[in-house]
Amino acid sequence: MHAEFRTDRGRIRHHNEDNGGVFENKDNQPIVIVADGMGGHRAGDVASEMAVRLLSDAWKETTALLTAEEIETWLRKEIQEVNKQIVLYAESEMDLNGMGTTLVAAIMAKSQVVIANVGDSRGYLLQNNTLRQLTEDHSLVHELLRTGEISKEDAMNHPRKNILLRALGVEGKVEVDTFVVPFQTTDTLLLCSDGLTNMVPETEMEDILKSKRSLSEKADVFITKANSYGGEDNITVLLVERNLMQKGRDAS
């Protein structure tokens, strides 16, 4: 597997509340994670850092999970535990009240990939030169779009597009979505925060992934492109290919 991770403050925000990286368990099986924190007074970066650290620490203590069913069970259980720990920590620190974070994570299983998500950080797959979104946003705007109350055009600039219906650290229990999809050697997996998807149209995202650039160059282009469109939020990108037994960079 080859993975490339990038995170950038963007052009507007004063600090970066995104987090993520590539982490391995005892049998060198990787998990890839992206989290986008929320909350005032830097509480968002506390929440996203906790989510990534707690989930990756739990993963580092496991041995290989070979089936999609095993991975789904593990992700649901551990993300629930991460949520519980963030809630407890926020309750113990007054200045962290109201903090939370999105989370999207993926683990490879033979010829498949298992993805889990909470919030509006997304997972995409480029397969057969076509980009498709694997995850569903847990947001007010997505719900309005799903029920036909607004159009896709309305959704792009909706004044309440940042309101989440699900996030880690908000309630004692959280519903976690999981998806199992084929993952071939010619495919590319993309995990990202909304700082990318709110800035760069999906047609351009697809073109970048289809280009002849290296995986590292593609990750850099995503950051550059989001900033060129305004960089209104923190931008995080994690790209994965399974055709190279090579590990990319972790979060710094």
Curated annotation (Swiss-Prot):
What membrane topology is given? Peripheral membrane protein
Q: How is the cofactor bound?
A: Binds 2 manganese ions per subunit.
Question: Cellular location of this protein?
Answer: Cytoplasm; Membrane
**Compositionally biased spans, kind Basic and acidic residues:** 1-18
Which EC class, in a word?
hydrolase
Please list the residues that bind Mn(2+) 2.
36, 194, 233
> What are its cofactors?
Mn(2+)
What would be an example GO MF term here? metal ion binding
> Which NCBIfam families does this one have?
Stp1_PP2C_phos (NF033484)
Q: Give the matching PANTHER family.
A: PROTEIN PHOSPHATASE
Protein name from the UniProt record: Serine/threonine phosphatase stp
Organism expressing this protein natively: Listeria welshimeri serovar 6b (strain ATCC 35897 / DSM 20650 / CCUG 15529 / CIP 8149 / NCTC 11857 / SLCC 5334 / V8)
